[in-house]
Design a protein with these regions (language model features):
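Surface-exposed, charged secondary-structure patches
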Residues: 89-129
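C-terminal motif of bacterial Sec signal peptides marking the signal peptidase cleavage site
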Residues: 17-20
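Short, low-complexity N-terminal intrinsically disordered segments enriched in polar/charged residues
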Residues: 22-66, 70
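Sec-dependent signal peptide recognition
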Residues: 5-12
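A short gly/proline-enriched turn/hairpin at secondary-structure junctions
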Residues: 73-83, 95-98
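Hydrophobic pocket/interface hotspot
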Residues: 52, 64-65, 72, 84, ...
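A mature extracytoplasmic/lumenal domain signature
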Residues: 68, 78, 109-111, 121-123, ...
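Short beta-strand edge/turn micro-motifs at domain boundaries
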Residues: 22-27, 135-162
Length: 165
């Protein structure tokens, strides 16, 4: 009788261990982490670039500023960095008030991962007759904020020689 009870206890223990292991496997397999899609992220960065160009040419400092994260840093040549979306909007607003030539931008390359994306761009400003006034290049780092890829760092400079003092 004692032997029979011992066998029952062992059998119940084996069944419980087997069931608990299966439940752990099921829980693990149902936890689906969204996969990062590089092609989708690249498309989003390209669309963000198009939005930036349109806003620049419309003179829309609010849309321009919203292309940046709240803690963004804009790093232009020969000046201190501008930090934060609000300050970046002020810069664009001052440029727009001074009069903006036509802006174009061409994406050269986009790369990155789910944490950070980067874009290499070539840009130009031209007058109403199409004459290039300035051209240059930039590197932008993007991070996800509020469900959108936004510029986190924007570093740009001109291809023209530095102005003489």
């Amino acid at each position: 009788m004692k032997k029979m009870n011992a066998i029952k206890v062992i059998l119940v223990a084996i069944i419980l261990v087997t069931i608990s292991c299966k439940k752990a496997e099921e829980t693990t397999s149902t936890e689906v982490k969204p996969t990062f899609d590089l092609a989708e992220a690249k498309t989003a960065i390209e669309v963000a670039g198009q939005t930036f160009v349109m806003a620049m040419n419309k003179g829309d400092s609010i849309t321009l500023a919203n292309c940046y994260t709240k803690d963004a840093k804009m790093m232009g040549p020969n000046e201190k960095s501008v930090i934060g979306r609000t300050e970046i909007q002020k810069v664009f607003s001052s440029w727009i008030k001074a009069g903006m030539p036509t802006f174009t931008m061409k994406t050269i390359d986009i790369w990155g991962n789910e944490e950070m994306m980067a874009a290499e761009e070539e840009w130009a400003f031209s007058d109403k007759d199409g004459k290039i006034l300035d051209s240059g290049k930039s590197i932008e780092l993007f991070k996800m904020e509020d469900g959108k890829w936004r510029m986190y760092r924007d570093c740009y400079n001109s291809d023209l020689p530095s102005p003489s003092k």
